């Protein structure tokens, strides 16, 4: 992709030099102005292509209107290529869903807005990326900044949630490939993050970050169907919820919380300002936590129990999964690049029974985890390293993965963006600051 | 943080993240205070504004945090710093307000000034900039259909329910779905990143409750950066005295340069560079002419 970008830029540059008439203003450019530009270029030792781009951009019409479009009239600038461009052309692995019935593993890719399906046995010791057996990608898919992913092995369908850019749950089938419309979609609250299915109840649970809520829908809900119930309120202890697991075996909802909390009020320009909110509540930074709610909980209901405290080591916990045979919970602990395993019944300031962490593990910025009781494996999706790592199910400590699934060649960097939408320039360090 | 000369697919040179930072993974604004070497970040999901040392790295706590009942912050979205007058400004769409704090404010402190109310016209405030030289504050505020969508320019010391001294917006401006705004202190030129030219679409939900009477449309992907040619975004530049329904005086636009969804804009005034952020990446443009005094479109001489 970098090559494509540079090629595009170079082509534009050639086009501008070859076909573009110099504008009257460009013809009047004094030597001092061009020298100033040359000086700026020379100071940075920018490569030849970038130099050409900058010089061509300098010659764009200044008064005669923009050659490629009539709007805005008589404005300077126009279709100008950048001299530098930073982006990651490869997918990232975010959410993970494991189907041991059909031997598939599905990943959500927030960076390129795609869903990638691989054979469950994909990956190994190779330094090369593995080819997905199926992918969903393109404008028809309505995929935005997607986060969690879930699979229904019986119906051979997979679900994902747009965390931003189109507040939708979309559902695709194993038969879908490429730029295809979802089989069905459901509108969701803004900043929904994860989805978990409850096959026996025929329901699904959705976490909503900004509302500090879990919304429940019928599994096949479409369009603008309303949630059948919602856990939300001060008593719930839901605080920036991310990963969710609908534990039908124990009638519990298990949720990973980052700890950020504010009493959100409507902010959309379509809503009037809300003033009748009762007592003003302060925003808060709470510790990360795993909360357990009754599966039938509805409204402002406290959790049944909570794993929280210094000993837990929880640090921006993301996706979670439950090992029903070992009665354990695994959580992708993004903040310290680890996977932490707790006893399902733990409460309070509990220590993990196992932690997979360290240089040998190759876990970098994990966003999700999946347990395969059938094949005795544990999967980790690494946002920070273009990989998914597969471990023995009870792996512990600083251990190497059994195999690694790559979506880019080994050691390919990643920018780490998750919907970046602002920037600042640090004059002291000559650096660009970007919040996520 | 990326080196200014970073190009291609590169990892950041420095990252501030983790539980101890009190950051979240949802932040839509940032400001750098070059006089005091500090980074200022609004945390929408915690109703807070955090200040970090300029060289902060890894899982480090902020040096100051503005949060609490006196602050009146609910969901601060964007931030600016005025190091000359020692003020931090944030805008909160939930409160429909621009809120000004002392730069050294920490903890549960009341703002020095609040610009909010019907006369201000402010609603979904997604961009904010301060110009201590010309003594103005600029808020970029969106509205769905009708009403005022655009740049609201206030006196720097404006307080309470006051009308803006100038407003840039209207059909000729094509301002609709924009975000970050920046000011070149040398000229006062105003830079705005616009993701696309469609007005903000109505969401299906009011927070976690379905919106009454909401009907789905086929094109409800208003934040999409998929690059629809008819609604592509741009970086627009205005002169400091601009007012009314006017087109930009200077523009960077696509297609072909991956600028379909420019949400953020930052300036390197020394190098005459413009950094545009969006679509999980950023691009740098070298445009010295954008850092000169801009004449009205159609005038005979663009240069000073």
Language-model region placement:
Chain A
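Short loop/turn segments immediately following the C-termini of beta-strands
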Residues: 110, 120, 163-164, 209, ...
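Structural signal for beta-propeller blades
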Residues: 113-115, 166-169, 212-214, 261-263, ...
